[in-house]
Amino acid sequence: MNPHTVEQPRPAPLPRTIVTGASSGIGRALALHLASLGVPVVAIGRDAVRLQSLAAQHLLIHAWPADLARIGEIDALAQQIVARFPDVGVLIHNAGIQHDLRMDDAGYGSADIQQEVDVNLVAPLAFTRALLPHLQGRRQACVVNVTSALAHAPKRTAAVYSATKAGLRLFTQALRVQLRGSSVRVVDAVMPLVDTPMTQGRGRGKLPAGQAAQALVAGLLAGRAEIHIGKARWVPALQRWAPGLLARMLQNA
């Protein structure tokens, strides 16, 4: 090898990627992992301070504070991102809220339900619709919806969260049918119980967020339409052969 030869940087495996819920947990880990692979990231989250801290860790991460519960602002958000970063080609809907409460708990109000439904379900639908014309104009693009094993069977203390993830899973399937034959891939990333601030104090045997992020990206690069991560890889078989067992396992997850 010529000692004076300058090694050319490898091309990024993915185009610029939007990651929602990037302030902490899986979203933060996704942003860092993607950036480490050379993928530019638009990191969206509500906590501007945490986002700036994240962006300071890698030059390829751009912090974009936004509250996705403000559904009426999502169209403008998508337009602003595309205007600033016209090379955006991947949208990962990771943001999520779970109130670990029963429906009859006195502290669980209508505003909590509205927030959960908006962030977990309505925002991904609205953001996808707003960004879709741009994505369809690219040679290759991808929408990734981060769902959960709870989309298959509900958790006792997370009725609304389980319902939103089931809705997001069905939306993923419907969108995939709509976009079949187009340049836009639609991917369902099914998560197990992951160690994040949202799951603090709940359950055992949680998958580290970094491992969850790496598995998601590996599945995405492998071209998979459904990525079952960690213990969630057992969900399809259990749902088919032992649905009662799966339901009992997830009720107290």
Q: How would you name each of these model-derived features?
A:
Residues T128, T164:
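Active-site helix of classical SDR
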Residues S23-S24:
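Conserved glycine-rich cofactor-binding loop
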Residues S148:
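Residue(s) in the substrate-gating loop at a strand-loop-helix junction
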